[in-house]
Design a protein with these regions (language model features):
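Extreme N-terminal starter segment of soluble prokaryotic enzymes
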Residues: 1-4
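Two-component/phosphorelay signaling modules centered on CheY-like receiver
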Residues: 11-35
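Helix N-cap/capping motif at the beta->alpha junctions
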Residues: 36-42, 64
Length: 140
């Protein structure tokens, strides 16, 4: 089962992102567990394993880049997709090898595209990720 984390201090973003991800996974028939966090400290306390994490860069108390570094130190190499209002963080964000960097506001088409790319990457990288992705041309 695919494990996805959404971490953004803005609950509005979490509430916008969750149904987009759920709908995408439902259409592709991919089972997943999705965890939501609005507090980066709680995320760091829990330190859950994940396949894909949507992570805000600018949060109170904890910076998303520092959160990602903490996960990397624990050898968690899931795919991190940054969400932010601040494009200037892109250079620094790449120090933890994120899979993607999306600017807000949330765009469903961009979310779906990066989800598809991340799932294809995970499937190629790890044989135990065999979930197949339904596209317009069939199952990949």
């Amino acid at each position: 089962m695919l494990s996805i984390i959404i971490c953004d201090d803005d609950q509005t973003i979490n509430h916008q992102l969750l149904p987009i991800i759920q709908q995408y996974l439902e259409q592709k028939k991919i089972p997943a567990a999705i965890q939501q966090y609005t507090d980066a400290k709680k995320l760091l306390e829990d330190m859950p394993l994940f396949d894909i994490m949507f992570l805000d860069v600018e949060m109170p108390e904890e910076n998303g880049i520092e959160v990602a570094k903490a996960f990397r130190k624990q050898s968690n190499w899931g795919q991190i997709i940054y969400l932010t209002n601040y494009a200037q963080y892109a250079q620094t964000a790449y120090s933890v090898h994120p899979f993607g960097y999306l600017t807000k506001p949330i765009d469903e088409e961009n979310i779906n595209k990066i989800l598809e790319e991340a799932l294809e990457y995970l499937e190629k990288k790890s044989p135990h990720h065999q979930f197949g992705v339904m596209t317009d041309t069939g199952i990949k």
